[in-house]
Amino acid sequence: MATYIVGDIQGCFDELQQLLKRVNFSTQHDQLWLAGDLVARGPKSLETLRFVKSLGDSAKVVLGNHDLHLLAVSYGLKKRKDKDKTTPIFLAKDREELLSWLAKQPLLAEHDEFVMCHAGISPQWDLETARQCAREVERIIQGEELPWLLKNMYSNLPDLWDDSLEGLDRYRYIINAFTRMRFCFSDGRLDMDCKLPPQEVTGDQLVPWFELPHRIPLEKTVLFGHWAALQGYIDEKVIGLDTGCVWGGSLTMIRWEDKQLFTQDALD
């Protein structure tokens, strides 16, 4: 059995199929972990949702910011972005089934040796806090209050974690950390604006969330996507897998057992 983790697909279905074919992926013996943003600007978001859903227990998925946006659009709470190629999802006969399945996916998935989320884990959280925060918001996403949360989650504030946060402030921070975070200010506040590669950031105010000096160390490796400008990032405890396939880059997948990387250049 092999465990494969893949970065942001964003509807780049054909590239995903090429990667899985290359490693002879077997639903009977292997597992595919997907680091969020299954849908958005790529040409085959509908096919991607259907395929990943069809994998059943052979797939582990976490929600990304584009996945949450798709759910918000489905409730009429947000407009579809011009660059998103998600209209076929809303025209599909199985749209309700697909969207219901998507809403049941977690913000944080855990393996014996690693955890996976879309953007990262707040530098102020230890692993147990991250688990608890994820479960708090997942209960809402998977319940009757989902439309309320989707309507009210869009905000860059609060930008600093405090365990005394309550209600929407607490949920917004948790969602932003798991699905939108890239840089932090030196005091730990989240920056929601800068998308540059770290080497292009001048000054010492902005630091990648995983390089913040006072970040709480985690006992497991964190695998994440979201940050295409990193073009992949690997160290002992952090692995970034988004290499911008939807932007003309590549789709990257890692086999956990031997840490071998597999890449597929964008086909379109």
Curated annotation (Swiss-Prot):
CDD domains: MPP_ApaH (cd07422). Pfam families: Metallophos. Disulfide bonds: none annotated. It is an enzyme of class 3 (hydrolase). One of its GO terms (molecular function) is bis(5'-nucleosyl)-tetraphosphatase (symmetrical) activity. Its EC number is 3.6.1.41. It catalyses: P(1),P(4)-bis(5'-adenosyl) tetraphosphate + H2O = 2 ADP + 2 H(+). It comes from the Bacteria. InterPro entries: ApaH (IPR004617), Calcineurin-like_PHP_ApaH (IPR004843), Metallo-depent_PP-like (IPR029052). Keywords: Hydrolase. Hydrolyzes diadenosine 5',5'''-P1,P4-tetraphosphate to yield ADP. Belongs to the Ap4A hydrolase family. This is Bis(5'-nucleosyl)-tetraphosphatase, symmetrical.
